[in-house]
C-alpha cells in the first residue's frame, strides 16, 4: 500500500462518517488508523477500513507512519492534535470550526507554513458544480447588498449548546455561509455584530445566542448581513440572497440558485457530491 496516501482519523463520529464515505471512493487513499474516545465508534470505523484503532491520538501519531490526518472532533477538543500531527510531518484536513481561539489557529497556521504542509478545512460548499456559474454572473453585476441566512432548529448534540464547547451558531454552523460570502464577494474589512437571547429559555445547559446578525463591509465596498438563528421549529432558511442593479440571485445552501432578471430567469441545481471537494 506504499503507493497510497496513508490517512489517520482523529474522531469517528457523525462528520467523520460523512468523510468515510468519500474515502471509500478514492482509490489512492488507505485509511490505516482511526481514533476516538468512544469504543463503539472506533471499533466500527476500524472494522470498516481494517484500520488500527486507537483511543489516544498521541499514541496513534507516535506509532503510525501517516501521510495525512483528518481532525473531526467537536470545536473545544482541538487541544494540540493538529500541532502534533504537524510535528510528525502530516498534511491536515481539519473540520470547521478549526479553532475556538485565534491564538491556537495562528499557531497551527504558522506550523503548517514552517513545514510546507498542505491544510484543508471543511468548507466544501464552494466546490458545488453550479458555484462557478453563480460567481461568474455576480462578477458582472452592480451589487447593492446581500442577506445571508442559517436559520433553523437546535442540533441535538450536547456540546453545541455551550459557548465554551461550540463557540455559538455563527462559529459552528453559519461559518459555511460566511465562507461562501468570502468566496463570492472577497475579503471583509469591517464588521458589526449583534445577538440576542431569551427565546430558547426551555433548553438546559444552553448559553449561546438564539439569534444574531453580522453586517460586513467588503474590500469592494459591498455590504452584506448574515443572520443566524437556532430557534425556528417550523422551518428556516439557509442561503444567500443578492440584490443587484439588474437582477437578483437566490442561493439555496447546497441546493442550487435562481437568477431573476427583467426578461429572464435562470435556475440551476447541484448535480455533484459537494463532499468530494475534500
Language model features with spans:
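N-terminal Rossmann-like dinucleotide-binding module
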Residues: 1-49
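Beta-loop-alpha module in the N-terminal Rossmann-like domain of NAD(P)-dependent dehydrogenases
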Residues: 19, 51-111
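Hydrophobic residues in well-ordered beta-strands that form the structural core
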Residues: 55, 94, 119-121, 147, ...
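Rossmann-fold dehydrogenase core element
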Residues: 106-124, 142-148
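C-terminal glycine/acidic-rich active-site capping loop/insertion
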Residues: 124, 238-278
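Predominantly a Rossmann-like dinucleotide-binding segment in NAD(P)-dependent oxidoreductases
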Residues: 125-205
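Contiguous beta-strand/loop segments that form the cofactor/metal-binding neighborhood of enzyme cores
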Residues: 179-256
